[in-house]
């Protein structure tokens, strides 16, 4: 049985469609209304708030955290200010896209990365030889996305 997200108590009464799915072990709304049209136009013309708690979240910290981030994303992490967030693809050494998501700079040597798929092992492989810790904090960090 999927786990309710930390926002489930607020989102469940709004789900008129009763359409739920298992997203990475969490109970997630497929659509709130019986027709997707209202939601579609709300996002296109104004804004929408999504519960994205099921996204996988990783905390990278240590002297080489920025070096690890630069190894796996296509943007330059050295240009990120503390508090800044990038949306970026994650790529392997050949440029093949592994995933995409956000990277937030939390401090000089601290980052949080989010992804749709579980990539802890892949991040740990790329961290080999670096002085950086990589932790899966998915269950400790809830998330909302304003789009």
Task: Map each language-model feature to its residues.
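Aromatic/His-enriched, Gly/Pro-containing loop or helix-boundary segments
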Residues: 85-104
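Short hydrophobic/aromatic-rich motifs at helix boundaries and adjacent loops
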Residues: 37-42, 95-97, 124-128
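Acidic, proline/glycine-enriched N-terminal capping motif
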Residues: 1-91
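Acidic, low-complexity central loop/insert segments
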Residues: 99-147
């Amino acid at each position: 049985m999927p786990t309710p997200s930390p926002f489930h108590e607020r989102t469940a009464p709004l789900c008129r469609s009763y359409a739920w799915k298992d997203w990475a072990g969490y109970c997630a709304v497929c659509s709130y209304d019986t027709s997707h049209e209202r939601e579609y136009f709300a996002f296109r013309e104004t804004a929408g708030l999504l519960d994205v708690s099921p996204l996988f979240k990783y905390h990278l910290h240590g002297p080489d955290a920025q070096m690890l981030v630069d190894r796996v994303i296509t943007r330059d992490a050295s240009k990120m200010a503390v508090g800044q967030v990038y949306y970026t693809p994650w790529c392997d050494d050949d440029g093949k896209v592994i995933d995409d998501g956000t990277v937030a700079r939390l401090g000089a040597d601290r980052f949080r990365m989010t992804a749709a798929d579980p990539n802890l092992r892949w991040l740990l492989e790329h961290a080999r030889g670096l002085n950086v810790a990589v932790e899966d904090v998915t269950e400790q960090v809830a998330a909302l996305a304003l789009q």
